Amino acid sequence: MHQVIQLKILDSRIGDTISLPAYATDGSAGLDLRVCISEPMQVAPQQTVLLPTGIAIYIADPKLAAVILPRSGLGHKNGIVLGNLVGLIDSDYQGELKISCWNRSQEHFTVNPGDRIAQLVFIPVVQASFEVVNEFTESSRGEGGFGSSGRY
């Protein structure tokens, strides 16, 4: 599936010294988002910072949304994850994409201009409505939760 999404460049470095979001490989699910800052920034242990990307997107289609996800290598190797765990971009949002970056490690981490810091994945959306009922049709699972379906 291919969908065209409007992208607005908010900082003149985008497309010049800082690359536009791009898929790293043909099989990549997420577009790499880069940090749009002027100089290196230190993120102290346990600190959370909001990093600009220099871009805004407008999805427009209410059957589509985007999620900002962490890059697995940053989290595993450096303890750098998203401060909000997952960022949800609604179809009608038009502001700058910003990355909430949390250094959960015990070491300082340097973010450099143009670093790939997160990834943007587009996902289909189903807007549900509710039917209020007094009872559910019984399922084999019932009300079991929090580990009830297996060892973990």
UniProtKB/Swiss-Prot annotation:
Per its record, the protein catalyses: dUTP + H2O = dUMP + diphosphate + H(+)
The cofactors named for this UniProt entry are: Mg(2+)
Q: Which domain of life is it from?
A: Bacteria
GO molecular function annotation: dUTP diphosphatase activity; magnesium ion binding
Q: For this protein, what is the EC number?
A: 3.6.1.23
Output the PANTHER family linked to this UniProt entry. DEOXYURIDINE 5'-TRIPHOSPHATE NUCLEOTIDOHYDROLASE
Instruction: Write out the function statement from the record.
Output: This enzyme is involved in nucleotide metabolism: it produces dUMP, the immediate precursor of thymidine nucleotides and it decreases the intracellular concentration of dUTP so that uracil cannot be incorporated into DNA.
**Protein name (record):** Deoxyuridine 5'-triphosphate nucleotidohydrolase
Q: Which organism is it from?
A: Legionella pneumophila (strain Lens)
Q: What gene is behind this protein?
A: dut
